[in-house]
From Swiss-Prot:
Disulphide-bridged cysteine pairs: none
GO-annotated molecular function: fatty-acyl-CoA binding
PANTHER family (alphabetical): ACYL-COA-BINDING DOMAIN-CONTAINING PROTEIN 6 (PTHR24119:SF0)
Function recorded in the entry: Binds long-chain acyl-coenzyme A molecules with a strong preference for unsaturated C18:1-CoA. Does not bind fatty acids. Plays a role in protein N-myristoylation.
Domain called ACB: residue spans: 6-94
High-level lineage: Eukaryota, Amoebozoa, Evosea, Eumycetozoa, Dictyostelia
Protein name stated in the entry: Acyl-CoA-binding domain-containing protein 6 homolog
Gene field: acbd6
Amino acid sequence: MTDAQIENKFKLAVDYITNNSGKLSNIKNEEQLYLYCNYKQATIGDCNTKAPPFYDYIGKSKWNSWNSLKGVEKIVAMNSYISLVNALSPGWDSNIKVERATQSVFLNDEEFKELEKKEKEEKEELKKLEEENGGEIEKPKSKWMGPVLSKFSLVDDETLEKLEKNTKQDLGYWVSVNDIERVKKEIENDKNIINEVDEDGRTALIWACDRGYFEIAKLLIENGSNVNVQDGEGMTPLHYAVVCDQFEICKLLLSQSSIDKSIKDNSDSIPSDFIDSSTSENIKSLFK
């Protein structure tokens, strides 16, 4: 098949999976991830989002699968997607004529932003309806194997909403919005706040490590932030830095004489236990 025919068949395969998710309920998790990551690679290209935090297990799995395809050409990802659909449902395309694609399924930046905007508006509308009906509203069933295009966030939506409504605007807030000048001012006003924790046990340093803000992390450490502090899940700043693949921050933390790499979280895991195939080689080298 020509590239144009592959592109068209890919689009049909995506439609087939989306419209027949009920019939394909026995698909294994790894097969779902395979479809997901190849869809993302085929329509967007290389992973362009930051790794989700450790506590977003589903998001992290999806991110890892997509990121593992870095460098794979879009047309190759399309073929991979089609091949698995063929294996899962032989003959699905027996009555379909593969013709030249009339509309590209590739997404440019403008289209991607427009889809994100639309998804956000739909989410806000659904939330509004829920509030008006006291939460008694039927939510649409998810068909995640289809074209799910929302970007991942390092912090879950609920936490972000809390931050937006945070009238206190404490040190953790200013770190989360990457305002280093305000962080400096807050520390100058009261150094005692540097190790204060939020309701989930996160300090300002943990926030900086989660979001990859190196300069802020460095500033916090220089001003006495505890590099071995544990949040509500027992995770240390180093746990966060490894999970979120933040090489410079990992290096910064490991350069501290007081760092303890052997601290276990509540699941009995030390930071290096989170190193997997998706972890950058630079980070892997730090723990050899």
